[in-house]
């Protein structure tokens, strides 16, 4: 029976390690803090590395994360074309299987748990036989057959939405909802907050937004409309807005450049870029409210759940958002539009909440939001996962 301490854990991630943290990065760090030896496998570098003599050669590098002694980062360059993934998946898997054998040899110690967040199915779980315990943990909306096939061989499946779990109903592995977590940097250390300090001092309200601004699934017209029609509100944005800042991808097309330029031109917008978690938490603590504005029809999460929600809730301040199914019956936690196909009413909802901010941020509501967030700390989520694994034995 696996426990989630004193183990060697290999995490398969579709996003590289970097400044911006998603669920897989937070779980890796929390598992390391709990006494596990964690190896975080970055997705492969594109294109084969070649020596001076010409033939392709694999490059596998394992090094310290720099933030915890138990957390190691694995970078690797393929010895075969990555494009095989899109044209000849069996050949790609043949090459990746040999690559994985070399990675495991480089690690040099037995793996107890493989924890996969990999919707691309780059490294199928069926490659890892007993006694390795295999966890499949999709936190993004699966699209395409490989995303579904990635669950094959899992001993247990966790996800942040019930909609995602439903898509894996064909697999016999037990399936459980585990909400997004929150890292220690965002957990309150003092007393519960009071009313907005900006309201007390007669200063402009500040509304926070976090996430990759390069994403094409943002509802850009609605967001620009909200900012332009609320000139007395300061909008502070954290997250990548240039390609070099992002470790989690994003568009570089002319529409994206035009959107970023429009934000930069607005006098009530501040773009902070990607920052470490501690700095992000400090910035959030200054906010009076938070805004989420995705186009559900394009949204990679399908408007079901977002990691940032838990971090916003940790401040106690109100969230104004497009429709999010996970929180549809929790009006104290979030103020959202009812529609699933458009955000036409989001600007009006934003104005209503801002005009009545003292009501939406009364102490009782703030306390409920903070307590909900604290109950979903990553340490608590790992405890829940460990118990669910134990209960299956």
Predicted regions and their residues:
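A short alpha->beta transition loop at the rim of the catalytic pocket in nucleotide-sugar-dependent
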Residues: 35, 288, 316-317
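Nucleotide-activated donor-binding/catalytic signature segment of Leloir-type glycosyltransferases, i.e.
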Residues: 239, 248-281
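Carbohydrate-associated surface elements
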Residues: 163, 181
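Acidic anion/phosphate-binding donor-loop and adjacent secondary structure
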Residues: 145-148, 182-203
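Nucleotide-sugar-dependent
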Residues: 18-22, 278-283, 290-313, 320-331
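A charged, aromatic-enriched C-terminal amphipathic alpha-helix characteristic of glycosyltransferases
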Residues: 194, 341, 358-391
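Conserved donor-binding/catalytic core segment of Leloir-type glycosyltransferases
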Residues: 199-218, 223-228, 235-238, 374
């Amino acid at each position: 029976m696996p426990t989630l301490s004193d183990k060697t854990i290999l995490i398969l991630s579709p996003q590289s390690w970097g400044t911006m943290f998603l669920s897989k990065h937070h779980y890796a760090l929390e598992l390391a803090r709990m006494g596990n030896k964690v190896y975080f496998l970055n997705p492969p570098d594109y294109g084969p590395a070649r020596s001076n003599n010409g033939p392709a050669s694999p490059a596998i590098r394992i090094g310290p994360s720099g933030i915890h002694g138990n957390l190691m980062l694995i970078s690797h360059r393929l010895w075969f074309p990555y494009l095989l993934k899109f044209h000849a998946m069996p050949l790609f898997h043949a090459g990746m299987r040999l690559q994985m054998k070399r990675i495991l040899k480089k690690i040099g110690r037995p793996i107890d748990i493989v924890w996969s967040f990999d919707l691309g199915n780059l490294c199928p779980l069926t490659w890892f036989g007993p006694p390795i315990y295999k966890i499949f943990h999709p936190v993004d909306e699966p699209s395409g057959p490989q995303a579904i096939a990635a669950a094959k061989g899992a001993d247990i499946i966790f996800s942040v939405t019930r909609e995602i779990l439903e898509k894996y109903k064909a697999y016999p592995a037990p399936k459980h909802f585990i909400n997004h977590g929150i890292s220690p940097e965002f957990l309150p250390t003092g007393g519960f907050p009071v009313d907005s300090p900006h309201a007390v001092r007669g200063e402009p309200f500040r509304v926070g937004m976090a996430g990759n601004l390069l994403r094409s699934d943002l509802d850009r017209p609605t967001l620009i409309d909200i900012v332009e029609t609320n000139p007395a509100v300061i909008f502070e944005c954290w997250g990548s807005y240039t390609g070099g800042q992002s470790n989690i991808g994003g568009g570089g097309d002319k529409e994206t450049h035009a959107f970023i330029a429009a934000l930069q031109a607005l006098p009530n917008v501040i773009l902070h870029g990607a920052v470490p978690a501690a700095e992000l938490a400090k910035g959030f603590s200054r906010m009076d409210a938070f805004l989420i504005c995705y186009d559900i029809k394009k949204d990679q999460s399908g408007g079901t759940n977002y990691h940032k929600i838990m971090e916003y809730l940790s401040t106690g301040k109100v969230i104004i958002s497009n429709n999010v199914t996970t929180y549809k019956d929790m009006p104290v936690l979030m103020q959202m539009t009812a529609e699933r196909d458009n955000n036409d009413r989001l600007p009006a909802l934003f104005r209503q909440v801002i005009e009545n901010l003292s009501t939406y941020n009364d102490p009782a509501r703030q306390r409920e939001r903070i307590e909900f967030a604290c109950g979903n700390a990553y340490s608590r989520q790992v405890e829940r996962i460990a118990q669910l694994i134990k209960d299956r034995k």
